[in-house]
Amino acid sequence: MSKNYLLGIDIGTSACKVAVFDREGKVIASATGDYPVYYPQEGWAQQKPDEWWSAVCSAVRKCLVKGDIPPEEIAGVGIDGQSWSAIAIDKEGKVLTDTPIWMDTRAQEICDRLNQEIGSDNIFQVAGNSLQPSYTTAKILWYRENQPEVYKNIYKILQSNSFIAYRLTGTVTQDLSQGYGLHCFNMHTGKWDEKMCEKLGIPMDFLPDIVPCDQVVGTVTR
């Protein structure tokens, strides 16, 4: 059977969008799946990654049915999504806690402290971004200071797109475009910066392998 279709997944803030295209780029079918943002305290904004996954699975099924497309004819899947989450998973792939998302500001004090201790200019020279609570860096450190039981069980920290890719393939990676959410990502080399990891206090073991955005990272597990 020929593989004539491409499937795209976008993890938005309020919903996922899924579409199937033919090889000429024509949209054959599309669907969405909604999920909430939770605001448990002032300045907090978090989501449940497992709800993203459920919404994606539902939207994919809707697309395939709507377009009358056999799953075997999907040649490839591309995934993008909201940036700057901090999805903590354990070695079994279980999500350890709700993830703060890009609009969350709970880690402002951590950012202020590190900008003083390390130097905001020094951080910027490596990462190309100022250290702010919206980024992933501060969220990881917030886990360490406020959720030690979560922190000690972290295997990897993922972003929205790498989390969905992991659920689809079982492969833990992070595409290059999302690396900038961590200030230990060296914008000049495109790699994790060991010295900045040490300064920030982020274990390199938490960080997935960085891969190009167009690299095939695996195949669907079922």
Predicted regions span which residues?
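N-terminal glycine/serine-rich phosphate-binding loop of ATP-dependent small-molecule kinases
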Residues: M1-T97, Q125, N153, P208-D209
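Gly/Ser/Thr-rich active-site cleft segment
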Residues: I11-T13, I123-R222
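Conserved donor sugar-nucleotide recognition element shared by glycan-biosynthetic enzymes
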Residues: P49-W52, V56, A107, T136, ...
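Conserved H-loop
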Residues: P70, S120, P203
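Hydrophobic or amphipathic alpha-helical targeting/insertion segments
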Residues: K91-V95, R113, E117, N122
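Carbohydrate-associated surface elements
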Residues: D104
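Active-site metal-coordination/substrate-binding segment of hydrolases
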Residues: I110
